[in-house]
Amino acid sequence: MQKAGLLLRGWTRAWKSVRMASSGLTRQNPLANKVALVTASTDGIGLAIARRLAEDGAHVVISSRKQQNVDRAVATLQGEGLSVTGVVCHVGKAEDREKLVNMALKLHQGIDILVSNAAVNPFFGNLMDVTEEVWNKVLSINVTASAMMIKAVVPAMEKRGGGSVVIVSSVAGFVLFPSLGPYNVSKTALLGLTKNFAAELAPKNIRVNCLAPGLIKTHFSSVLWKEKAREEMIKETMQIRRLGKPEDCVGIVSFLCSEDASYINGETVVVGGGTPSRL
């Protein structure tokens, strides 16, 4: 009886290995043969995410507003042996969003993953001093463009039988960053966008989840840490011991895009080093 049980367990493990291999999936390559679009992915968190998705087996299309940045990032990642291409894309422009989607379809005949990472923050100061122009710019890029980007990829994902979207918000959506009012508001809006799209797209087998990074040391966040005194004040306020690195954010994104997260939808995961992060 014991011998039969051992044989059965061995057969089960072998069958699981065959099943994973037949689908092109392995624990080393959980995103094998998937096609991923990552916006704002030539630097910082976006670049780190693009690298990790490619390392995990995906074909990644990166994008940014400037051609030289796209060229540099593509050369770097291809030099690491990763399957990466790139295109200029200003997510606030409909024609650029269409160009990004069309490149993925032309090169890889489908789209499985979208990481919506693009954001702007043109203002630092008191909320009462924010102009209408600034409000429109922040909400247009940080919120509306994310919604339009998701809308653009859904038809392609449907043809593949489903897909996964990760919206990059921020811990600022829960706990305000000082003097970044419009940015904070836009990131809170993305939490709601995640919930609404998750519910609406679930019947299409498209999952929508959200990453909320804490204070990550990138060029984008440098206004909060480039002065040592300000960095220490921010760390104390956020109750963290150190600033995060872009690489701290990548594992959870790859997981959310994988089959291991097939029963996770509409959730926001905070990667914030312990920053209090609930509304």
UniProtKB/Swiss-Prot annotation:
The modification N6-acetyllysine is found at K93, K106, K217. The record marks N196 as: Important for the maintenance of the quaternary structure, the catalytic activity and cold stability. It is an enzyme of class 1 (oxidoreductase). InterPro entries: NAD(P)-bd_dom_sf (IPR036291), Sc_DH/Rdtase_CS (IPR020904), SDR_fam (IPR002347). The record marks F177, L180 as: Responsible for the stereoselective reduction of 3-ketosteroids into 3alpha-hydroxysteroids and benzil into S-benzoin. GO terms for cellular component: mitochondrion; peroxisomal membrane; peroxisome. It holds the Pfam family adh_short_C2. GO terms for biological process: alcohol metabolic process; ketone metabolic process; positive regulation of reactive oxygen species metabolic process; retinal metabolic process; retinoid metabolic process; steroid metabolic process. The active site is at Y183. It is found in: Peroxisome. GO terms for molecular function: 3-beta-hydroxysteroid 3-dehydrogenase (NADP+) activity; alcohol dehydrogenase [NAD(P)+] activity; all-trans-retinol dehydrogenase (NADP+) activity; carbonyl reductase (NADPH) activity; identical protein binding; oxidoreductase activity, acting on NAD(P)H, quinone or similar compound as acceptor; retinal dehydrogenase activity. It catalyses: a secondary alcohol + NADP(+) = a ketone + NADPH + H(+); 3alpha-hydroxy-5beta-pregnan-20-one + NADP(+) = 5beta-pregnan-3,20-dione + NADPH + H(+); 5beta-dihydrotestosterone + NADPH + H(+) = 5beta-androstane-3alpha,17beta-diol + NADP(+); all-trans-retinol + NADP(+) = all-trans-retinal + NADPH + H(+). Its EC number is 1.1.1.184, 1.1.1.300. CDD domains: CR_SDR_c (cd08936). NADPH-dependent oxidoreductase which catalyzes the reduction of a variety of compounds bearing carbonyl groups including ketosteroids, alpha-dicarbonyl compounds, aldehydes, aromatic ketones and quinones. Reduces all-trans-retinal and 9-cis retinal. Reduces 3-ketosteroids and benzil into 3alpha-hydroxysteroids and S-benzoin, respectively, in contrast to the stereoselectivity of primates DHRS4s which produce 3beta-hydroxysteroids and R-benzoin. In the reverse reaction, catalyzes the NADP-dependent oxidation of 3alpha-hydroxysteroids and alcohol, but with much lower efficiency. Primate DHRS4s display different stereoselectivity and catalytic efficiency in the oxidoreduction of some substrates as compared to other mammal DHRS4s due to a difference in conserved amino acid residues. The C-terminus peroxisomal targeting signal tripeptide is important for peroxisomal import. Once in the peroxisome, it is involved in intersubunit interactions. Three specific residues, Phe-177, Leu-180 and Asn-196 are conserved between non-primate mammals whereas the respective residues are serine, phenylalanine and threonine in primates. The two residues at positions 177 and 180 are molecular determinants responsible for the stereoselective reduction of 3-ketosteroids and benzil. The presence of an asparagine at position 196 is important for the maintenance of the quaternary structure resulting in stability at cold temperature and improved catalytic activity toward retinal. PANTHER family: DEHYDROGENASE/REDUCTASE (SDR FAMILY) MEMBER 4 (PTHR43943), DEHYDROGENASE_REDUCTASE SDR FAMILY MEMBER 4-RELATED (PTHR43943:SF8). This is Dehydrogenase/reductase SDR family member 4. It comes from Rattus norvegicus (Rat). The lineage of its organism: Eukaryota, Metazoa, Chordata, Craniata, Vertebrata.
